[in-house]
Amino acid sequence: MSELVPPNIPAEFLPRHIALVMDGNGRWATEKGMKRTEGHRRGEAVLLDVVDACLALGVPYLSAYAFSTENWRRSTEEVRFLMGFNRDVLRRQRDGLHEKGVRVRWVGRRPRLWRSVIRELEAAEELTKDNTNMTLAMCVNYGGRAEIIDAAREIARQAAAGQLRPEQINEKTFPDFLDEPDMPDVDLFLRPSGEKRTSNFLLWQSAYAEMVYQDKLFPDFTPQDLFDAVEEYARRDRRFGTA
């Protein structure tokens, strides 16, 4: 990061929240004749570079799609690797993130997730809970539809118990039932790899997000690619449904 200078973008034109789909790790490795797992290893370093780039820009919130609820459909070998890998990444990187003033938050479901992964996620949250330079939401065992379903179930439970009236639920109160109620809406939805879809990521939060898709696979993604995406975001006219 030291040799890169972030673009000079006024704070009011910066995204407050970037959602990052870290896509293409497996394809990157396959194209190079490596095991798919090597692509994920490379992705760890790239994510840290993205965090540094966000800090340099002054972007306060980054959500990283680390493991989706659909990823359980992958081979047993790859799922086992990804569970251990996510656990070890948190263990390796939490102190460094803490030193940079990054607050780590976990967004996702507990069921099926390895207990060792949960322990590391909770340890990272506890260590970094008072940091204010930036928030990194690690989305592990996360799915946008699952999050909305879980919220709907909790609303139904409270309504059945007489704790909640239907008219109390609206666009302002519904997020209180999501995995991370304090998460701001996504401003910039960024996906490398050439794929142009949301893949069930932060569906509620991304209602008015600006989508930027880049052709580069995630292991080849650089801070400059992030800067380019943020510059494109800053040039757009966000109307939020108005004329």
Curated annotation (Swiss-Prot):
Keywords for the protein's UniProt record, in alphabetical order: Magnesium, Metal-binding, Transferase
Cofactor comment text: Binds 2 magnesium ions per subunit.
Bilayer-crossing regions: none
Domain of life the protein comes from: Bacteria
Binding site for Mg(2+): D23, E210
GO biological process terms on file: polyprenol biosynthetic process
InterPro entries assigned to the protein according to its UniProt record, in alphabetical order: UPP_synth-like, UPP_synth-like_CS, UPP_synth-like_sf
GO molecular function: ditrans,polycis-undecaprenyl-diphosphate synthase [(2E,6E)-farnesyl-diphosphate specific] activity; magnesium ion binding; manganese ion binding; Z-farnesyl diphosphate synthase activity
One GO CC term on file: cytosol
EC number(s) given by UniProt: 2.5.1.-
Residues reported in the UniProt entry to bind substrate: 24-28, 36, 40, 68-70, 72, 74, 191, 197-199
Required cofactor names: Mg(2+)
Catalytic residues identified in the record: D23, N71 (proton acceptor)
PROSITE patterns to which the protein is assigned, alphabetical: UPP_SYNTHASE
Pfam name, any one: Prenyltransf
Recorded family membership: Belongs to the UPP synthase family.
Biological role stated in the UniProt entry: Catalyzes the condensation of isopentenyl diphosphate (IPP) with allylic pyrophosphates generating different type of terpenoids.
Subunit comment: Homodimer.
PANTHER family: DEHYDRODOLICHYL DIPHOSPHATE SYNTHASE 2, DEHYDRODOLICHYL DIPHOSPHATE SYNTHASE FAMILY MEMBER
Protein name per UniProt: Isoprenyl transferase 2
Record organism: Corynebacterium efficiens (strain DSM 44549 / YS-314 / AJ 12310 / JCM 11189 / NBRC 100395)
